[in-house]
Amino acid sequence: MNHIPVLSSELISGLVIRPRGLYLDATLGFGGHTKLILAAAPEVKVVAIDQDKQALDSSQTLLASYNSNIQFCHSNFADYDPQNLKFDGILADLGINSVQLDTPERGFSFRHQGKLDMRMNQQQTITAAKIINHWEEVKLANIFYTYGEERLSRRIARKIIESRPLETTTELAEVVANCVPYKYRYGRIHPATRVFQALRIEVNQELSRLETFLKNAPHWLKIGGRIGIISFHSLEDRLVKHSLRNASILKVLTKKPIQPQDNEVAINPRARSAKLRLAEKLS
């Protein structure tokens, strides 16, 4: 499993891991951040949740030597109920992990041919294919514009309607690319990037679930406990920024977001858009 956690040293130092502390990893993925938390201080325990059962199962194997210090939970962070637990720190890494992105059958990437799926939680019924092949033109254009900030949203939606049915990621990517002026088709950013982002957000209801999590999570912290959120695009970062700032029980610790150093981006290009924001519970 080749997934490199992003901004890991900045996150771990920002959370100030305490001996015998209890931490919530709200987006376990393949366990990179959890492993670093457990190694940062003695007798630390982590509650690790993820909506992706495949990632959760893999992490239980990868973190087998730490399992006595980890409680695994299959849940979306918006639905998680800590009951009576209070945490010394909470983290959420909002990015799609590299393993999901590089697994063609998950349908997240236009770089690999696979079915248009994009579900983080494989138990849910709505897929990218259902949206692409059954939604009306106006609704498609709206999600491309709102969640992808795609300026050609109407043109792309119209072309999708004309080209349906579309079954694979590469078919959709080709339709989108053909809507873009030729000189922009082969730049650094693939022309389908924004459409794929918008679809993934819609399929998984990412922003509404993030909003719920950000409203609930501060109340799960002990006084003096910290929360760190890593976002990867402007819609997420804006929501994180305003939610942390508007929570009366939190003190924001990052006036501006922490971003990766050049050497991290050189090793892991997917880190380039990451932003970390931190806050501490006051009362």
From Swiss-Prot:
GO molecular function: rRNA (cytosine-N4-)-methyltransferase activity
Source superkingdom: Bacteria
One Pfam assignment: Methyltransf_5
Any one GO cellular component localisation term in the record: cytoplasm
HAMAP family: 16SrRNA_methyltr_H
Family statement drawn from the similarity comment of this UniProt entry: Belongs to the methyltransferase superfamily. RsmH family.
Cited function: Specifically methylates the N4 position of cytidine in position 1402 (C1402) of 16S rRNA.
Protein name listed in UniProt: Ribosomal RNA small subunit methyltransferase H
Species of provenance: Trichodesmium erythraeum (strain IMS101)
Chain's gene name: rsmH
